[in-house]
UniProtKB/Swiss-Prot annotation:
Protein name as it appears in the record: Dual-specificity RNA methyltransferase RlmN
Record-linked PANTHER family: 23S RRNA METHYLTRANSFERASE, RADICAL SAM CORE DOMAIN-CONTAINING PROTEIN
Record keywords: 4Fe-4S, Cytoplasm, Disulfide bond, Iron, Iron-sulfur, Metal-binding, Methyltransferase, rRNA processing, S-adenosyl-L-methionine, Transferase, tRNA processing
UniProt entry tagged with the keyword Disulfide bond: yes
PROSITE patterns: RADICAL_SAM
Binding site for [4Fe-4S] cluster: C117, C121, C124
Annotated positions binding S-adenosyl-L-methionine: G171, E172, S203, S225, L226, H227, N303
Places the protein is found: Cytoplasm
Additional facts recorded: Reaction proceeds by a ping-pong mechanism involving intermediate methylation of a conserved cysteine residue.
InterPro entries for this protein: Aldolase_TIM, Methyltransferase_A, RlmN_N, RNA_MTrfase_RlmN, rRNA_lsu_MTrfase_RlmN/Cfr, rSAM
Amino acid sequence: MTNAIDKKVNLLDLNREGIKEFFREMGEKPFRAEQVMKWLYHFCVDDFDEMTNLNKALREKLKQVAEIRAPEVREQQQSSDGTIKFAMTLFDGQDVETVWIPEGDRATLCVSSQVGCALECTFCSTGAQGFNRNLSVAEIIGQVWRVNQLLGAYGKTGIKPVTNVVMMGMGEPLLNLNNVVPAMELMLDDLGFGLSKRRVTLSTSGVVPALEKLRERIDVMLAISLHAPDDELRNEIVPINKKYNIEEFLASSRRYVEQSKAQRKVTVEYVMLDHVNDSTDQAHALAKTLKDTPSKINLIPFNPFPGSDYGRSSNSRIDRFAKVLMEYGLTVMVRKTRGDDIDAACGQLVGDVIDRTKRILKRQQKQRGGEAIAVKTT
């Protein structure tokens, strides 16, 4: 087994096939992998000694070559509406934020995929802070794992805290495709968290080549961050549009949905920026832009953050905008803002995370004698 003794393998980094291969290399039967996955994801167990249907020799062997390691909760804040924001410390000491949003019999977890974000959308706090690095598979799925464990996981209280996952936290998921896809596979896998395809949503700002690859690899719900009715405005507020314009983005989204068994319409996210993208003329333009794309539109009231140049559209402007879209037969929803009193709402995820990350990076650089730290973006 390659480097198994020199470096323990984090089992949360492996999807079903990866864990089976790991056990094969150990000389164990594949069913042992399935037993361990159930302990990992159905009971959120992180101690091999608690896996009582494994013999003692195997448990001892696993202790030597494997570990179960998820991000740790450094801090949590609870909103007046019940939303909880978790500051999660990653394996190198940096932080990301994860948000748990309860509503009736469902609870949605907003999961981060990167430390910071490279796309620099002008209305997003995370994008304003810059990009540091991608999260590993274990750091992504580990957010779900840790919240399930913390809030009362399977078999412990009878509660299943996370019923839905949205890849809408810090970062652009499609710029970390090779780690995001295995993590989502574990969300869907019956031996993982067992969520249905309709309960896992990936949101993207339009990395078109990666969206084409996503279509070939996994079927989950797709949400697209559009935020403008035309290329001129989108170039300004979502800079990646200069590389992949609206027409390319929508065409790729249509191809994804046409192949999908999870959804028939693209979910279009549109943040409402006061007197920037919220006029009735822009509503008409948006409807015409979407005329060939089966879609439902999610209007998102802007959530201000320190240093932002934008204001939130008034309720009356949002209502007028929605009515125009509905005149074209479009399905329109206005997202209810959750967790804004703890900076956990859409576009606000950063808190003191980036400042803490920068301090850690400076310390690491100093330890390395000022050597630049390489960052992968794809």
